[in-house]
Amino acid sequence: MNLLTKERGLAYVQLARIDKPIGTLLLLWPTLWALWLAADGLPDLWTLLVFVVGVFLMRSAGCVINDYADRNFDGHVKRTAGRPLPMGKVKPREVLALFAVLALISFALVLTMNPLTIGLSFAALLLAVCYPFMKRYIPIPQLVLGMAFSWSIPMAYAAQANALPAVAWLVFLANLLWTIAYDTQYAMVDRDDDLKLGLKSSAILFGRHDKRIIGALQLLTLLILLLVGQLSELGSSYYWSLLAAAALFVYQQRLIRERQREACFQAFLNNNYVGALIFAGVVINYL
Protein backbone atom coordinates (compact mmCIF):
# COMPACT_ATOMS: atom_id res chain seq x y z
CA MET A 1 0.00 0.00 0.00
CA ASN A 2 2.81 2.41 0.88
CA LEU A 3 4.54 1.60 -2.41
CA LEU A 4 1.34 2.30 -4.36
CA THR A 5 0.85 5.59 -2.52
CA LYS A 6 4.45 6.59 -3.20
CA GLU A 7 4.11 5.78 -6.92
CA ARG A 8 0.87 7.75 -7.14
CA GLY A 9 2.47 10.71 -5.38
CA LEU A 10 5.43 10.59 -7.76
CA ALA A 11 3.03 10.54 -10.72
CA TYR A 12 1.36 13.72 -9.43
CA VAL A 13 4.77 15.35 -8.98
CA GLN A 14 5.59 14.49 -12.60
CA LEU A 15 2.22 15.74 -13.85
CA ALA A 16 2.76 19.09 -12.12
CA ARG A 17 6.43 19.20 -13.29
CA ILE A 18 7.58 19.88 -9.73
CA ASP A 19 10.68 17.89 -10.66
CA LYS A 20 11.30 20.20 -13.67
CA PRO A 21 11.21 23.82 -12.44
CA ILE A 22 12.43 25.48 -15.66
CA GLY A 23 8.90 26.40 -16.79
CA THR A 24 8.10 27.90 -13.39
CA LEU A 25 11.26 30.00 -13.50
CA LEU A 26 10.56 31.23 -17.04
CA LEU A 27 7.10 32.32 -15.87
CA LEU A 28 8.40 33.77 -12.59
CA TRP A 29 11.14 36.10 -13.85
CA PRO A 30 8.94 38.42 -15.98
CA THR A 31 6.32 38.41 -13.22
CA LEU A 32 8.98 39.70 -10.84
CA TRP A 33 10.15 42.28 -13.40
CA ALA A 34 6.59 43.60 -13.55
CA LEU A 35 6.07 43.67 -9.78
CA TRP A 36 9.26 45.67 -9.18
CA LEU A 37 8.59 48.03 -12.08
CA ALA A 38 4.99 48.62 -11.01
CA ALA A 39 6.07 49.35 -7.43
CA ASP A 40 9.15 51.41 -8.36
CA GLY A 41 11.07 49.08 -6.07
CA LEU A 42 10.18 46.37 -3.57
CA PRO A 43 6.51 45.42 -4.04
CA ASP A 44 4.00 44.82 -1.27
CA LEU A 45 5.11 41.61 0.45
CA TRP A 46 1.69 39.93 0.42
CA THR A 47 1.29 40.73 -3.27
CA LEU A 48 4.76 39.31 -3.90
CA LEU A 49 3.90 36.11 -2.01
CA VAL A 50 0.59 35.69 -3.86
CA PHE A 51 2.26 36.02 -7.24
CA VAL A 52 5.20 33.74 -6.45
CA VAL A 53 2.90 31.00 -5.15
CA GLY A 54 0.41 31.68 -7.93
CA VAL A 55 3.09 31.29 -10.60
CA PHE A 56 4.06 27.92 -9.16
CA LEU A 57 0.45 26.72 -8.95
CA MET A 58 -0.67 27.94 -12.37
CA ARG A 59 2.41 26.68 -14.17
CA SER A 60 1.72 23.28 -12.59
CA ALA A 61 -1.95 23.55 -13.56
CA GLY A 62 -0.93 24.38 -17.13
CA CYS A 63 1.31 21.32 -17.31
CA VAL A 64 -1.45 19.11 -15.93
CA ILE A 65 -4.05 20.25 -18.46
CA ASN A 66 -1.39 20.01 -21.20
CA ASP A 67 -0.85 16.33 -20.37
CA TYR A 68 -4.60 15.74 -20.46
CA ALA A 69 -4.90 17.42 -23.86
CA ASP A 70 -1.92 15.46 -25.25
CA ARG A 71 -2.82 12.11 -23.68
CA ASN A 72 -3.30 10.46 -27.09
CA PHE A 73 -0.07 11.88 -28.53
CA ASP A 74 2.53 11.77 -25.74
CA GLY A 75 3.06 8.03 -26.01
CA HIS A 76 4.30 8.49 -29.60
CA VAL A 77 6.87 11.21 -28.79
CA LYS A 78 10.26 10.17 -27.49
CA ARG A 79 10.55 13.04 -24.98
CA THR A 80 7.06 12.56 -23.49
CA ALA A 81 6.49 8.79 -23.70
CA GLY A 82 7.42 8.33 -20.03
CA ARG A 83 4.83 10.77 -18.66
CA PRO A 84 2.28 9.39 -16.16
CA LEU A 85 -0.77 9.36 -18.49
CA PRO A 86 0.75 7.42 -21.42
CA MET A 87 2.37 5.08 -18.89
CA GLY A 88 -1.05 4.38 -17.32
CA LYS A 89 0.03 5.56 -13.85
CA VAL A 90 -2.97 7.91 -13.52
CA LYS A 91 -6.42 8.12 -15.07
CA PRO A 92 -7.65 11.10 -17.13
CA ARG A 93 -10.27 12.01 -14.51
CA GLU A 94 -7.54 12.20 -11.86
CA VAL A 95 -5.62 14.61 -14.06
CA LEU A 96 -8.67 16.86 -14.43
CA ALA A 97 -9.25 16.74 -10.67
CA LEU A 98 -5.66 17.80 -10.01
CA PHE A 99 -6.01 20.68 -12.47
CA ALA A 100 -9.20 21.83 -10.73
CA VAL A 101 -7.54 21.77 -7.29
CA LEU A 102 -4.52 23.77 -8.48
CA ALA A 103 -6.70 26.32 -10.29
CA LEU A 104 -9.04 26.75 -7.30
CA ILE A 105 -6.17 27.34 -4.88
CA SER A 106 -4.75 29.91 -7.30
CA PHE A 107 -8.11 31.65 -7.55
CA ALA A 108 -8.44 31.71 -3.75
CA LEU A 109 -5.15 33.62 -3.63
CA VAL A 110 -6.26 36.03 -6.37
CA LEU A 111 -9.42 36.81 -4.37
CA THR A 112 -7.20 38.65 -1.86
CA MET A 113 -6.24 41.12 -4.61
CA ASN A 114 -8.20 44.08 -6.02
CA PRO A 115 -11.14 43.73 -8.47
CA LEU A 116 -9.01 44.59 -11.53
CA THR A 117 -6.59 41.76 -10.77
CA ILE A 118 -9.45 39.33 -10.10
CA GLY A 119 -11.03 40.21 -13.44
CA LEU A 120 -7.77 39.66 -15.31
CA SER A 121 -7.35 36.26 -13.67
CA PHE A 122 -10.23 34.80 -15.70
CA ALA A 123 -8.34 35.50 -18.92
CA ALA A 124 -5.27 33.84 -17.38
CA LEU A 125 -7.27 30.68 -16.73
CA LEU A 126 -8.75 30.72 -20.24
CA LEU A 127 -5.30 31.00 -21.82
CA ALA A 128 -3.92 28.19 -19.66
CA VAL A 129 -6.76 25.88 -20.71
CA CYS A 130 -6.74 26.84 -24.40
CA TYR A 131 -3.02 26.61 -25.16
CA PRO A 132 -2.61 22.80 -25.11
CA PHE A 133 -5.38 22.38 -27.68
CA MET A 134 -4.00 25.03 -30.05
CA LYS A 135 -1.33 22.60 -31.30
CA ARG A 136 -4.07 20.96 -33.36
CA TYR A 137 -5.57 24.09 -34.89
CA ILE A 138 -3.20 27.03 -35.39
CA PRO A 139 0.23 27.03 -37.08
CA ILE A 140 1.92 28.92 -34.23
CA PRO A 141 0.50 27.74 -30.88
CA GLN A 142 3.51 29.41 -29.23
CA LEU A 143 1.64 32.70 -29.71
CA VAL A 144 -1.04 31.52 -27.27
CA LEU A 145 1.63 30.16 -24.93
CA GLY A 146 3.35 33.55 -25.06
CA MET A 147 0.12 35.26 -24.05
CA ALA A 148 -0.40 32.77 -21.23
CA PHE A 149 3.18 33.18 -19.97
CA SER A 150 2.88 36.99 -20.19
CA TRP A 151 -0.54 37.50 -18.63
CA SER A 152 0.92 37.68 -15.12
CA ILE A 153 2.54 40.99 -16.18
CA PRO A 154 -0.66 43.07 -16.50
CA MET A 155 -1.96 41.21 -13.45
CA ALA A 156 1.14 42.28 -11.50
CA TYR A 157 0.65 45.93 -12.50
CA ALA A 158 -3.03 45.68 -11.62
CA ALA A 159 -2.30 44.19 -8.20
CA GLN A 160 0.51 46.58 -7.31
CA ALA A 161 -0.64 49.84 -8.95
CA ASN A 162 -4.35 49.18 -9.64
CA ALA A 163 -3.70 50.38 -13.18
CA LEU A 164 -2.60 49.13 -16.59
CA PRO A 165 -0.18 51.74 -17.96
CA ALA A 166 1.27 51.54 -21.45
CA VAL A 167 4.60 50.31 -20.09
CA ALA A 168 2.84 47.22 -18.69
CA TRP A 169 1.79 46.24 -22.20
CA LEU A 170 5.30 46.87 -23.52
CA VAL A 171 6.70 44.44 -20.94
CA PHE A 172 3.89 42.06 -21.94
CA LEU A 173 4.86 42.33 -25.62
CA ALA A 174 8.58 41.87 -24.92
CA ASN A 175 7.88 38.75 -22.90
CA LEU A 176 5.46 37.44 -25.53
CA LEU A 177 8.16 37.65 -28.21
CA TRP A 178 10.79 36.15 -25.92
CA THR A 179 8.46 33.25 -25.08
CA ILE A 180 7.86 32.49 -28.77
CA ALA A 181 11.64 32.53 -29.30
CA TYR A 182 12.53 30.13 -26.50
CA ASP A 183 9.57 27.84 -27.05
CA THR A 184 10.55 27.57 -30.70
CA GLN A 185 13.93 26.30 -29.49
CA TYR A 186 11.99 23.80 -27.35
CA ALA A 187 9.76 22.84 -30.29
CA MET A 188 12.83 22.16 -32.44
CA VAL A 189 13.50 19.19 -30.15
CA ASP A 190 10.14 17.59 -31.04
CA ARG A 191 9.82 18.80 -34.64
CA ASP A 192 10.21 15.39 -36.31
CA ASP A 193 7.75 13.71 -33.93
CA ASP A 194 5.21 16.54 -34.27
CA LEU A 195 5.35 16.29 -38.07
CA LYS A 196 4.55 12.57 -37.91
CA LEU A 197 1.60 13.20 -35.58
CA GLY A 198 0.22 16.11 -37.60
CA LEU A 199 0.73 18.59 -34.76
CA LYS A 200 1.63 22.23 -35.33
CA SER A 201 4.42 24.37 -33.89
CA SER A 202 6.44 27.47 -34.65
CA ALA A 203 9.48 25.27 -35.36
CA ILE A 204 7.51 23.58 -38.15
CA LEU A 205 6.05 26.85 -39.44
CA PHE A 206 9.41 28.65 -39.53
CA GLY A 207 11.14 25.69 -41.18
CA ARG A 208 14.65 26.46 -42.44
CA HIS A 209 14.23 30.09 -41.34
CA ASP A 210 13.84 29.07 -37.68
CA LYS A 211 17.23 30.35 -36.47
CA ARG A 212 16.85 33.73 -38.17
CA ILE A 213 13.33 34.22 -36.87
CA ILE A 214 14.40 33.28 -33.33
CA GLY A 215 17.20 35.84 -33.63
CA ALA A 216 14.77 38.51 -34.85
CA LEU A 217 12.39 37.78 -31.96
CA GLN A 218 15.26 38.02 -29.48
CA LEU A 219 16.38 41.34 -30.97
CA LEU A 220 12.85 42.76 -30.81
CA THR A 221 12.58 41.61 -27.19
CA LEU A 222 15.71 43.56 -26.27
CA LEU A 223 14.62 46.67 -28.21
CA ILE A 224 11.25 46.76 -26.46
CA LEU A 225 12.92 46.24 -23.07
CA LEU A 226 15.24 49.15 -23.91
CA LEU A 227 12.13 51.28 -24.43
CA VAL A 228 10.72 50.02 -21.12
CA GLY A 229 13.91 51.17 -19.43
CA GLN A 230 13.61 54.62 -20.97
CA LEU A 231 9.95 55.04 -20.04
CA SER A 232 10.56 53.74 -16.50
CA GLU A 233 13.70 55.91 -16.12
CA LEU A 234 15.85 52.95 -15.12
CA GLY A 235 19.57 53.24 -14.43
CA SER A 236 22.70 51.66 -15.84
CA SER A 237 22.34 48.33 -14.00
CA TYR A 238 19.26 47.57 -16.08
CA TYR A 239 21.01 48.28 -19.37
CA TRP A 240 24.01 46.18 -18.37
CA SER A 241 21.59 43.32 -17.70
CA LEU A 242 20.14 43.71 -21.20
CA LEU A 243 23.65 43.61 -22.64
CA ALA A 244 24.32 40.38 -20.72
CA ALA A 245 21.01 38.98 -22.00
CA ALA A 246 22.07 39.87 -25.55
CA ALA A 247 25.30 37.91 -25.04
CA LEU A 248 23.28 34.89 -23.90
CA PHE A 249 21.07 35.17 -26.98
CA VAL A 250 24.21 35.06 -29.15
CA TYR A 251 25.33 31.98 -27.24
CA GLN A 252 21.93 30.36 -27.85
CA GLN A 253 22.28 31.01 -31.57
CA ARG A 254 25.56 29.12 -31.51
CA LEU A 255 23.90 26.23 -29.69
CA ILE A 256 21.08 25.83 -32.22
CA ARG A 257 23.17 26.36 -35.34
CA GLU A 258 23.16 22.62 -36.21
CA ARG A 259 19.59 22.07 -34.94
CA GLN A 260 20.67 19.10 -32.81
CA ARG A 261 18.01 18.07 -30.30
CA GLU A 262 20.13 18.23 -27.15
CA ALA A 263 21.74 21.53 -28.15
CA CYS A 264 18.32 23.09 -28.87
CA PHE A 265 17.11 21.94 -25.46
CA GLN A 266 20.19 23.46 -23.81
CA ALA A 267 19.47 26.74 -25.60
CA PHE A 268 15.93 26.64 -24.23
CA LEU A 269 17.20 26.03 -20.68
CA ASN A 270 19.67 28.90 -20.99
CA ASN A 271 16.77 31.36 -21.08
CA ASN A 272 16.43 30.95 -17.33
CA TYR A 273 19.64 32.97 -17.00
CA VAL A 274 18.26 35.63 -19.34
CA GLY A 275 15.24 36.17 -17.10
CA ALA A 276 17.34 36.11 -13.93
CA LEU A 277 19.86 38.64 -15.27
CA ILE A 278 17.16 41.11 -16.29
CA PHE A 279 15.50 40.75 -12.89
CA ALA A 280 18.84 41.39 -11.19
CA GLY A 281 19.27 44.53 -13.28
CA VAL A 282 15.81 45.78 -12.27
CA VAL A 283 16.34 45.06 -8.56
CA ILE A 284 19.81 46.66 -8.43
CA ASN A 285 18.36 49.75 -10.09
CA TYR A 286 16.08 50.32 -7.09
CA LEU A 287 18.68 49.69 -4.35
From Swiss-Prot:
HAMAP family: UbiA. It is found in: Cell inner membrane. Pathway: Cofactor biosynthesis; ubiquinone biosynthesis. Its cofactor is Mg(2+). One of its GO terms (cellular component) is plasma membrane. The keyword Aminoacyl-tRNA synthetase does not apply. Belongs to the UbiA prenyltransferase family. The keyword Secreted does not apply. Catalyzes the prenylation of para-hydroxybenzoate (PHB) with an all-trans polyprenyl group. Mediates the second step in the final reaction sequence of ubiquinone-8 (UQ-8) biosynthesis, which is the condensation of the polyisoprenoid side chain with PHB, generating the first membrane-bound Q intermediate 3-octaprenyl-4-hydroxybenzoate. The gene is ubiA. This is 4-hydroxybenzoate octaprenyltransferase. It is a multi-pass membrane protein.
